[in-house]
């Protein structure tokens, strides 16, 4: 552990310890030369790699607002460090704790941004290999205003780690927390492919599909840990939940997203869409990206089919037809909701509306 206040490479002052990821410790630092806050990442003991520098050089070529920028690579006292863009927010796995699942408008916005970031990286020759909600940072509170895919800078280290685990036995039976956390989103070719065979960009597309399934349903498409490996092997995927298409207000967009995700989860890597295909398809989707608010349902009227939300800046009217999911808000235990607003009289109209967990 690096002490707070220490200066790395005469440049990076450690401000706080953010936490430990699967393969690295992460610190918030201040770049003393640029007066810029960054995330400084260093591999955990035993995971240092000579290929780390090569990976960092490749990732530094990626310049896109949906990818956390790699700024610097330094070595000091036998340790190696990667300086990456700092995102003041939470990752998608943490954000999902506020929801049972995301509505399709939220989901389409996230998918579109992820696809653009992945496309930029693939064009630079960088394959992530470990895409999952915890590797996607967002800021803006309830908003998805600053989505960044992180850890492209350690892509080579990730592959080396997976290769070493596979060389010592069945990768899917590894006790490593890193691998266990990756399995629900890992492609079949990464789980069960031939040793030494090159991993292609299509593996990221599978992971993106699995991640979007998780965000839109609240469930993992193939389960977790060893169950995920068994179910991927036997092609035993969870069905889409009925609530996604049972409400006419959300049916069309949900069906479009399901079609995209089904294509991403094709077992034949050559049949999956490319990142460019996904960006083009997302550009045809009709989804709302208006600002989101959090408020409390304070009154239901018309026999419970509509009501009002106490929120900022104004109270809003909503219809139960605008509520997404199998559960509906009430004025007791399930009364906090996330929503967008549109002009209405005498008060704004809320849509879409989704339950929010504090």
Where are these regions (language model features)?
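AlphaC helix of the eukaryotic protein kinase fold
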Residues: 44-61
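Conserved short submotifs of the Hanks-type protein kinase catalytic core
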Residues: 77-91, 95
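A short, aromatic-enriched beta-strand patch in the conserved N-lobe beta-sheet
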Residues: 72-73
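Protein kinase glycine-rich loop
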Residues: 15-21, 26
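Activation segment signature within eukaryotic-like protein kinase domains
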Residues: 110-111
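Catalytic-loop of the protein kinase fold
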Residues: 126-139
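Protein kinase catalytic-loop region centered on the HRD/HxD motif
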Residues: 116-126
């Amino acid at each position: 552990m690096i002490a707070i206040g220490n200066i790395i490479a005469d440049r990076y002052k450690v401000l706080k310890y953010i936490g430990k990821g699967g393969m690295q410790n992460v610190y918030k630092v201040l770049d003393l030369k640029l007066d810029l806050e960054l995330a400084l990442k260093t591999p955990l003991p035993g995971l240092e790699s000579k290929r780390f520098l090569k990976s960092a050089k490749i990732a530094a070529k990626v310049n896109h607002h949906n990818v956390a920028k790699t700024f610097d690579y330094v070595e000091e006292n036998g340790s190696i460090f990667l300086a990456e863009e700092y995102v003041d927010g939470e990752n998608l796995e943490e954000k999902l704790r506020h929801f049972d699942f995301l509505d399709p408008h939220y989901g389409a916005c996230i998918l579109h941004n992820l696809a653009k970031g992945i496309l930029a990286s693939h064009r630079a020759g960088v394959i992530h290999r470990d895409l999952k909600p915890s590797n996607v940072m967002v800021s803006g509170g309830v908003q998805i205003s600053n989505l960044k895919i992180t850890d492209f800078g350690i892509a080579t280290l990730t592959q080396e780690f997976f290769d070493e685990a596979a060389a010592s036995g069945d990768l899917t039976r590894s006790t490593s927390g890193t691998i266990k956390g990756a399995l629900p989103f890992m492609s079949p070719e990464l789980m069960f492919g031939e040793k030494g065979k090159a991993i292609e960009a299509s593996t990221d597309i599978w992971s993106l599909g699995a991640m979007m399934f998780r965000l839109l349903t609240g469930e993992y498409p193939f389960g977790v840990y060893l169950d995920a490996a068994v179910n991927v092997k036997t092609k035993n995927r969870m069905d889409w939940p009925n609530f996604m298409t049972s409400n006419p207000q959300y049916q069309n967009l949900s069906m479009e997203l399901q079609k995209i995700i089904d294509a991403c989860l094709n077992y034949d890597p050559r049949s999956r869409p490319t990142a460019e295909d996904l960006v083009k398809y997302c550009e045809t989707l009709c989804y709302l990206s208006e600002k989101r608010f959090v408020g409390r349902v304070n009154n239901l009227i018309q026999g419970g089919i509509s009501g009002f939300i106490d929120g900022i800046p104004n109270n809003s009217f909503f219809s139960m037809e605008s509520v997404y999911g199998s559960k509906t808000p009430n004025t007791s235990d399930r009364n906090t909701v996330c929503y967008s607003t549109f002009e209405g009289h005498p008060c704004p109209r809320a849509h879409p509306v989704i339950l929010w967990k504090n």
